Design a protein with these regions (language model features):
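Ser/Thr/Pro/Gly-rich, low-complexity intrinsically disordered stalk/linker tracts of secreted
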Residues: 5-492
């Protein structure tokens, strides 16, 4: 069997009325030049009472345990099923199904050619847009048996509010998977299919997405298992690119979760989870950031702005490893730089409720609390995320500190929003200010620019000499810090 192929075995079990029990299904695979075989067991409940709507099992596995590498994702799930009059059907027809991956796993729709919405609807997508393969089983088959089906999965032009989109096919037509980054504290990659067909309801699906689609160029399934050639196909491309990348965090990972609702009970979701194998090799990930920080005025003892520019190289080479994700970044301003009381007196504050940390809700911070602008670049998006920096309410912020700020950056077309809290500490002996961003999202950030306003909205004023230090550190099994210093003399 080729990687991604599915072998389906159905076993009929006769159960006496009033009996509830369970059986264990066990499977073992060997060969393929593997050093050792692999085994798995799955316990299935057997009952004379029909199952209610739900997902009986979920599996999400990766092709490599190397952190930050190009990996294939294979995920499979089965809806609870009933047999009536010899016909297999789901306990209820699924309406929406969504898969959330652990933080740090990312897909880059910009790295692969896209299929137009029209071509996707008519099943005429070019091979270059293929990024995976799906094997499905649906109801209403011949003689009441489930209908097996196989299809390539295509990278599709997204709609407004989507990071990306994928299209696969059932006998009755296409299914669209919407890709997005959840606007919560973990910023997980989410794949969701809405309004699934009820004419031929979905029973099960096994989906494989390729880390490097060009590596799977071949015949592949064309709505039927291929009789010759590889078990599945892929795009041909002159320069292979990375579509799917594993997280840059080592050790135990959060579970992948799948939620689903039904047409008979919409918005009533069931949820199952699947543990993911731990990743390793974080110390191998490259991390070579550069940063510059400078005031934007040349007059001392005046409310000043600051320009912070952070850049992290991001390689799309599928044979290499991705850069480690930025975890923390801090900037320590020079001695003598203090809070500009004249400017701060005219500012308002943004509350935790106004900013809505960990929520996709719209930001309602007062305009008078805005103290700067922000821009974030990522290879996942064609356009940067842009937004504002707000002064947080003193002592009523995530740090309970007198000084803090909120950073909000959005890309509305892709539906991506990032909200961060930044701590501002004043050294009790020297008065030096340190601005720190902690636990940044596990996303590939290639650039981060912060501009703190000067003038009436400025929150800092300078002495005659400026010496700025800043450090940033990587995530992973071993933390690695980079520290830089810069100097600038102002007119007094």
């Amino acid at each position: 069997m080729a990687p991604g192929d599915v072998l389906r075995i159905e076993i009929a079990v006769k159960v006496s009325p009033g009996i509830t029990s369970s059986v264990v299904n066990a499977a073992t695979v060997t060969g393929g030049d593997a050093e050792a075989g692999a085994s798995v067991e799955d316990r299935t409940t057997i009952s004379s009472t029909g199952a209610g709507f739900g997902v009986s099992d979920l599996a999400a596995t990766w092709s490599s345990e190397q952190a930050g590498s190009s990996v294939n994702l294979t995920t499979g799930f089965t809806f609870n099923q009933v047999v009536n009059g010899g016909e297999t059907a789901p306990a209820a027809d699924a309406k929406e199904v969504a898969l959330n991956l652990p933080p740090g796993f990312v897909a880059n729709p910009e790295a692969v050619p896209q299929c137009s919405v029209s071509d996707a609807e008519h099943d005429t997508c070019p091979a270059a847009a293929a990024v995976g393969v799906a094997f499905t089983s649906s109801g209403s088959g011949v003689g009441g048996a489930p209908t097996p089906y196989s299809s390539l999965v295509y990278n599709t032009v997204p709609s407004p509010g989507e990071l990306g989109a994928l299209t696969l096919f059932l006998p009755t037509g296409p299914i669209r998977l919407s890709l997005g980054i959840r606007s919560n504290s973990d910023y997980e990659l989410r794949m969701a299919a809405n309004d699934l067909p009820s004419l031929e309801p979905l029973l099960s699906m096994t989906l494989t997405l390729w880390g490097v689609p060009a590596a799977y160029d071949g015949a592949g399934p064309d709505h039927a298992p291929a009789e010759t050639g590889p078990g599945f196909g892929g795009p041909g491309a002159p320069q292979p690119t990375r579509f799917l990348t594993s997280a840059g965090t080592c050790g135990a990972l959060p579970a992948s979760t799948l939620s689903a609702d039904s047409w008979t009970a919409p918005s009533v979701f069931v949820e199952v989870s699947s543990m993911t194998s731990a990743l390793s090799g974080c110390t191998r990930l490259p991390f070579d950031p550069s940063i510059s920080v400078a005031p934007d005025i040349s007059e001392a003892n005046e409310p000043s702005g600051y320009e912070l520019d952070l850049n992290i190289p991001q390689s799309g080479n599928p044979e290499g490893l991705a850069s480690a994700d930025l975890k923390d970044a801090s900037v320590t301003l020079p001695e003598g730089v203090g809070i500009s009381l004249s400017a701060a007196n005219g500012l308002q504050a943004c509350t935790e409720r106004d900013v809505g940390l960990g929520s996709p809700a719209a930001v309602t911070c007062p305009e008078a609390s805005k103290v700067g602008d922000v821009e974030v670049q990522t290879p996942l998006l064609a356009n940067p995320l842009q937004g504002a920096i707000y002064l947080a309410t003193p002592n009523a912020n995530p740090f309970g500190s007198p000084l803090a700020m909120y950073i909000v950056a959005e890309e509305p077309w892709a539906g991506v929003s990032i909200k961060l809290a930044g701590q501002i500490d004043a050294n009790q002996l020297t008065g030096q200010l340190t601005i720190a961003l902690r636990a940044l999202p596990q996303l590939p950030i290639s650039g981060l620019q912060l501009h703190l306003f000067g003038g009436r909205a400025g929150v800092a004023e300078h002495p005659c000499s400026v010496r700025v230090s800043h450090e940033h550190e990587r995530t992973g099994a071993v933390e690695r810090k980079h520290q830089r210093h810069s100097h600038q003399r102002l007119r007094c």
